[in-house]
Amino acid sequence: MRIALDAMGGDHAPGEIVKGAIEAAEELHLQILLVGRPDAIEPLLKEASAGARSRLDIVAASEVIAMDESPATALRKKKDASIVVATRLVKEGRAQALVSAGSTGAQMAASLLGLGRISGIDRPAIATILPTLEGGKLLLDVGANSEAKPRNLLQFAHMGSIYAEKVMGIANPRVALLNIGEEETKGNELVLGAYGMLREAPLHFIGNVEGRDIFFGRADVIVCDGFVGNVVLKFGEGMVSALKTMIKDELKNSRMAQLGALLAAPALRGMGKRLDYAEYGGAPLLGVNGVSIICHGSSKAKAIKNALRVARQGVQQNFIAAIQEHIPGKVEPVC
């Protein structure tokens, strides 16, 4: 198995990206194609052991799509951009998955154009794993579609359910619709329409959940449009960051608190690990005809290593084939 890694994408590229690739090659024994400028990548590989270096190959790409560039315009003008070349490697079968911490819009567009949509899927969705009291749970869409139709949410639910079962190992995953109340009569036109479709679909649909339910792990797959999902995701990131700052501030102001923190250090480290997005790697772009993993733009080595692990799991569990097999037959009769 080979995974194409966009070495030039992200706030900390190429240094942290290549470092994450080296760690993945050493610890996970992955074969990785580093896509980008050889003159920028090659010097960084001196840190790799001989075994890891043998699993890392460079594929030249002379251009980079910046975060603030228009994805459509950039893809037309920059045919040799690292994300374009990495996607092409998957399309041609030279790699089995794609990972990037670069422009999300560019990766979505490149994946759609290069890999195509799975038959029966109208729009792809970005799915992310959220830490909850019951372990990691899947939220989608978190940014691919700021607007959606009930039919799209139904398709997201099917894809999310398959991914949760195949890749996350959750048997008969509970699917819920994110809403402003638990009652089926609440919500806007989108949510009300989706509720009726989900209720009739061959899914383990448990109804609506509210925002306060998400982190208690009440559902395994939570479905919403990309606007709402992105707000939830960014709110969660901000809340975790604020809580960490609050704890540090309180510790500075109290010697007793500092003593307590020493005693509670193992528990605090465990909590920090559970809340660290880097532990979960990247978010799969579900609905495209290939494994495409989107990483946070500020990803460092640990996040990249874990994103490569997620990509490997996706390929090994063959969730793309599962979606291809189940989606058309399940979705069409309902709509």
Curated annotation (Swiss-Prot):
GO terms for cellular component: cytoplasm. NCBIfam families: plsX (TIGR00182). Belongs to the PlsX family. Its EC number is 2.3.1.274. It comes from Heliobacterium modesticaldum (strain ATCC 51547 / Ice1). SUPFAM superfamilies: Isocitrate/Isopropylmalate dehydrogenase-like (SSF53659). Catalyzes the reversible formation of acyl-phosphate (acyl-PO(4)) from acyl-[acyl-carrier-protein] (acyl-ACP). This enzyme utilizes acyl-ACP as fatty acyl donor, but not acyl-CoA. The gene is plsX. Homodimer. Probably interacts with PlsY. Disulfide bonds: none annotated. It is found in: Cytoplasm. GO terms for biological process: fatty acid biosynthetic process; phospholipid biosynthetic process. The keyword Endoplasmic reticulum does not apply. Keywords: Cytoplasm, Lipid biosynthesis, Lipid metabolism, Phospholipid biosynthesis, Phospholipid metabolism, Transferase. It catalyses: a fatty acyl-[ACP] + phosphate = an acyl phosphate + holo-[ACP]. GO terms for molecular function: phosphate:acyl-[acyl carrier protein] acyltransferase activity. This is Phosphate acyltransferase. Pathway: Lipid metabolism; phospholipid metabolism.
